[in-house]
Amino acid sequence: WIGTVLAFYFGKANFEAATQSYKDAIKTLTPEEKISRLAVKDVMLPVKDIVYLDLAEESDKPIPAILEYERFKPYNRFAVLDKNMVVKYMIHRGVFYQFLYNSFQSKETSTENQPKNVTLKDLLESNDEQFKKMLNRSVGFISISANLLDAKRVMDATEECFDVFVTQTGKNSEPILGLLTNNRIFQYAKV
């Protein structure tokens, strides 16, 4: 019976040592090692929780009205999706304000060009190269089977990218399944 007690005691000590070793190892993981262990599907904002603009329904809405939408008050980025839930644009609040300002400053200011009448469609169809560039950047795409480090790498490789959308295979022509923002990745990368 003494052997049984000693085996139990040392077995418990070994278990506690192993547990402590595991805890110490977790603490020493780098942020990249930590996020490489997290599946995108487990940490993304699911599509049902994404606040977005419906391209077909809202393209004729005045930009000032869009900026006043209650659902967007906490956000500085506006995802624009088509009827198939495919991302068309990610527009930063500042782009809207800059476009309104430019419309107001335009020498062709008329009743239609007054900022209160400028629509989302006007922005999307603008011939101004500055706005074309702003509308066609800053979004990445990744497969649902990827990990968070993969998402960070996509973000790092894309100029001024703050958002990575999750699709089935990572193609931008597919319906989105979720979203990872730079803030969300940073949150999970904290050690």
Where in the sequence are the language-model features?
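Canonical hydrophobic alpha-helical transmembrane segment
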Residues: W1-L6
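Membrane-proximal soluble helical/coiled-coil segments
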Residues: P31-L123
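The conserved cystathionine-beta-synthase
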Residues: L53-Y75, V80-D82, L100, D122-D128, ...
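Glycine-rich acetyl-CoA-binding "A-motif" of GNAT/NAT acetyltransferases
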Residues: V86-M90, N172-L179
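Membrane-proximal helical linkers
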Residues: F8-L45
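HAD-like aspartate-dependent phosphatase fold
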Residues: L29, S106, N182-R184
